[in-house]
Amino acid sequence: MSERKYFGTDGIRGKVGESPITPDFVLKLGFAAGKVLARHGSKQIIIGKDTRISGYMLESALEAGLAAAGLSAAFTGPMPTPAVAYLTRTFRAEAGIVISASHNPFDDNGIKFFSTEGTKLPDDVEAAIEAEMEKPITCVESAALGRASRIVDAAGRYIEFCKGTFPSQLSLNGLKIVVDCANGATYHIAPNVLRELGATVISIGVQPDGMNINKECGATDLRLLQERVLAEKADVGLAYDGDGDRIMMVDHLGHKVDGDQILYLIAREGLRQGELRGGVVGTLMSNMGLELALKQLGIPFARAKVGDRYVLEKLKEKGWRLGAENSGHVILLDKTTTGDGIVAGLQVLTAMVRNHMSLHDLCSGMKLLPQILVNVRFSGSSDPLEDARVKAVTAEAEIELKGRGRVLLRKSGTEPLIRVMVEGEDEALVSTLANRIADAVKAV
């Protein structure tokens, strides 16, 4: 298949007001998507968004395009990405559309699609939408125009779904939990889920104003959560990103618990309960400590390319059910069709309650190796990954690690960045090597 013009690894994303995230582009995208998706039968599309101020503008443009193509839009209002996937399935809709730029700042936004099964759209459907966008908009006859409606109980439906992934014989009674919703799409969902399961909940990041999403809070900035967990003497802290498809956690000592550790805890509990089917999938960025800890448990481990869509592809290829990225995207195919921060967190809380153990103690079976990640912004036509000097410095670093570490260079799928990752047993050496390689990349 030829390279896609607009769709990246996670839909279409960019700065609001700049191509492609403009009202006219999104209207045309809605029409093109409507024309392609209408061929499959259903006439309804679910549309959700996070809390960015630009969401109002973009959902209106999408609705106009879809209506012109003869499809009706059902709006959820602010809703986590995995909730839109769930509602798309339960409503038997033709597709779901999420307006979000996930963990990015408020002045970015994006559009991503879910199939009727609640999974990412196949590449060939995205390609068909791009091809349709090259054609002019030709509105259907007036009698065939789409309508717009609102799903008034969308939040309640998803809250009950999330609670259903927590064992009915258990409760969170006695647990004090601080939850950081990043002023994003989980702000009216996650605290209620935890409270209704019995926890004492302290909520932060639950006052979205359209411009404070992900700002010094949420899964990408844990400082506020760590401070609050310690101040409140809470048992655990949970942090989601702006659209709720990823999670980070904090133990009662204020220590960060990342996606690799969360994956380990869920896999180990699944093994103990006889529920784990096959192995688990991580990514090229997953810490070696995860691989070693799973090996000790006899759990097979496979690495996918970075990106939740690639984790999902590897799970399907292997016939396995559990995978995650260290950034906190956790996919539990026995419960969901896509990464779901709230559901993933509930599985860790299940392990805490069932084993009467703190999050800190549960994590003691896995030792993370020191890992340094340096992001280097690049521009221009030259490819730093093909540069002879960068290759030479990388090869030298691998020799210095003596087989007891890893070096990984890769391009970001969503930003003009080269990510330089080095891990190994010696933190000082790892830091030195990562910065040396980053300097070589900057010099290109």
UniProtKB/Swiss-Prot annotation:
Q: Report the GO molecular function annotations.
A: magnesium ion binding; phosphoglucosamine mutase activity; phosphomannomutase activity
Q: Where is the active site?
A: S102 (phosphoserine intermediate)
Q: Which GO terms describe its biological process?
A: carbohydrate metabolic process; peptidoglycan biosynthetic process; UDP-N-acetylglucosamine biosynthetic process
Record keywords, A-Z: Isomerase, Magnesium, Metal-binding, Phosphoprotein
What EC number(s) are associated with this protein in UniProt? 5.4.2.10
Q: How is it modified after translation?
A: Activated by phosphorylation.
Q: Which cofactor does it need?
A: Mg(2+)
Please report a single Pfam family linked to this protein. PGM_PMM_IV
SUPFAM superfamilies for this protein: Phosphoglucomutase, C-terminal domain (SSF55957), Phosphoglucomutase, first 3 domains (SSF53738)
Q: Which reactions is this enzyme annotated as catalysing?
A: alpha-D-glucosamine 1-phosphate = D-glucosamine 6-phosphate
The role this protein plays is: Catalyzes the conversion of glucosamine-6-phosphate to glucosamine-1-phosphate.
Q: Which family does it belong to?
A: Belongs to the phosphohexose mutase family.
What name does the UniProt record give this protein? Answer: Phosphoglucosamine mutase
Give the species.
Erwinia tasmaniensis (strain DSM 17950 / CFBP 7177 / CIP 109463 / NCPPB 4357 / Et1/99)
